[in-house]
């Protein structure tokens, strides 16, 4: 497994305990880092880079989404890179923060007829890619990012989360 220094903060009592989340996130993000290193030639720093994960609720993520993106509504995941990074370049020692809202993950998982864990896995991978400079602001970026997500999730035994859907460009 690729080494990452994962820091976890739990702000909502509905999330599993810290140890459970840490093991889960180490497996998911470790697999993502290995896939990117081995298949996409993504370099990583010599020291394990730090990723901060905040597991929160809809109200908190709505406040953050309104402040930083001008969207006064909850969202599933937000990512904040610690430093500007270009895809394929060595990131800094701190990758940044990924914030995930439990109620939105639960609601979307139910709507998508997926398990909570499978949807959370997808959102962790999605947020991790944002920390490494990937985005989905246009068709080309969305195609690249969604393709990576699909291949990483396949390594984890999960199906294509975008199958039968249009590209998810950010408005």
UniProtKB/Swiss-Prot annotation:
Keywords annotated in UniProt: Cytoplasm, Endonuclease, Hydrolase, Metal-binding, Nuclease, Ribosome biogenesis, rRNA processing, Zinc
Q: Which InterPro entries match?
A: MetalPrtase_cat_dom_sf_prd, YbeY, YbeY_CS
Gene3D superfamilies cross-referenced by the UniProt entry: Metalloproteases ('zincins'), catalytic domain
For this record, the Gene Ontology CC terms, alphabetical, are:
cytoplasm
Q: Which cofactor does it need?
A: Zn(2+)
Which top EC class is given?
hydrolase
This entry's Enzyme Commission designation comes to 3.1.-.-
The keyword Zinc appears for this protein: yes
SUPFAM superfamilies in the record? Metalloproteases ('zincins'), catalytic domain
Where does it reside?
Cytoplasm
| Molecular function GO labels | metalloendopeptidase activity; RNA endonuclease activity; zinc ion binding
Q: Which GO terms describe its biological process?
A: rRNA processing
Show the Pfam families listed in the entry: YbeY
Q: Which residues bind Zn(2+)?
A: 126, 130, 136
PROSITE patterns from the UniProt entry:
UPF0054 (PS01306)
Protein's job? Single strand-specific metallo-endoribonuclease involved in late-stage 70S ribosome quality control and in maturation of the 3' terminus of the 16S rRNA.
Which HAMAP family has this protein been placed in?
Endoribonucl_YbeY
The name of this protein is: Endoribonuclease YbeY
Q: Which organism is this entry from?
A: Rhizobium etli (strain ATCC 51251 / DSM 11541 / JCM 21823 / NBRC 15573 / CFN 42)
Which gene holds the coding sequence for this protein?
A: ybeY
């Amino acid at each position: 497994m690729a080494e990452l220094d994962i820091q976890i903060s739990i702000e909502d009592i509905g999330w599993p305990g810290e140890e459970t989340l840490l093991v889960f996130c180490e497996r998911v993000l470790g697999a993502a880092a290995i896939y990117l290193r081995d298949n996409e030639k993504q370099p990583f720093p010599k020291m394990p880079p730090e990723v901060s994960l905040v597991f929160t609720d809809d109200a908190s993520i709505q406040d953050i989404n309104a402040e930083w993106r001008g969207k006064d509504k909850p969202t599933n995941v937000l990512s904040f890179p610690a430093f500007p990074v270009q895809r394929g370049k060595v990131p800094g020692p701190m990758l940044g923060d990924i914030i995930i809202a439990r109620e939105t993950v639960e609601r979307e998982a139910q709507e998508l007829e997926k398990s909570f864990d499978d949807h959370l896995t997808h959102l962790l991978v999605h947020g991790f890619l944002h920390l490494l400079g990937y985005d989905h602001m246009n068709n080309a970026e969305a195609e690249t990012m969604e393709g990576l997500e699909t291949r990483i999730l396949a390594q984890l035994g999960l199906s294509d989360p975008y199958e039968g859907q249009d590209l998810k460009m950010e408005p």
